[in-house]
Amino acid sequence: MTSATLAGRRALVTGGSRGIGAGIVRRLAADGAAVAFTYGASAAEADKLVAELTADGAKAVAIQADSADPVQVANAVEQTVSALGGLDVLVNNAGTAYLAPIDEFPQEEFDRVVAINIGGVYSAIRAAVSHLGEGSRIINIGSINADRVPTGGTAVYAMTKGAVASLTRGLARELGPRGITVNNVQPGPIATDMNPDEGEFANAVRQTTALGRYGHTSDIAAVVSFLAGPESGYVTGANWNVDGGFTA
């Protein structure tokens, strides 16, 4: 562990077995939190991450759940509470994308993108909120596409992330009197296995960022860790663009 700023905190990260989610799980665990995370299909990836964190002395639990299914999401929350003894931090990271022009967008793909990117966030918060006490944190992982849509075919994805930003603001008002903060982290171009930082497209993206580079999962995880910790207690209802100046 690198620090103990989150010692005693119990966190659930949806979609935490790979990419940005795995980066968040690693950072929260390194900062002292006990962490549960959900995964979709790859039990091998999830088990490997649990083994890695456990070897480092962290408490980690992997839970299989389809974020498009409200029942599975609710069950994941209950399993987290049972395994960790409670819940203080919910990070809604699970998401999906399907890119196509609107007149070529399959209805079944539209339904699934909405079910995961909006429904999954709603379902997790609805199930978790009764377990969250004063000082708890809800952190949504949105996208800078909620504010800027630079290419065609991304309208549906951007719509879902815009909905998450609106939900964040509304719930910040609703849950503020209970001492629960709600914030939205909006990543820009982040290098992952699904979003490589090499190739012609990546070179074009780099030219649109103020810093001239892709971000790393650790860049997102650092902001999430701050929002999960004690020093962010007066921060709520905010959209945090972590994008290297992509939206500047």
Each language-model region and where it sits:
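A conserved structural motif in NAD(P)-dependent oxidoreductases
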Residues: A210-I220, E231
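Active-site helix of classical SDR
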Residues: I125, T160, T168
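Conserved glycine-rich cofactor-binding loop
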Residues: S17-R18
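The beta1-alpha1 cofactor-binding region of Rossmann-like NAD(H)/NADP(H)-dependent oxidoreductases
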Residues: A43-A44, Q64-A76, Q107, S218-D219
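Substrate-binding pocket helix/loop in short-chain dehydrogenase/reductase
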Residues: P101-I102, P106-V114, V205
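Alpha-helical segment proximal to the catalytic Tyr-Lys
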Residues: S130, R173-P177, G233
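Residue(s) in the substrate-gating loop at a strand-loop-helix junction
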Residues: S143
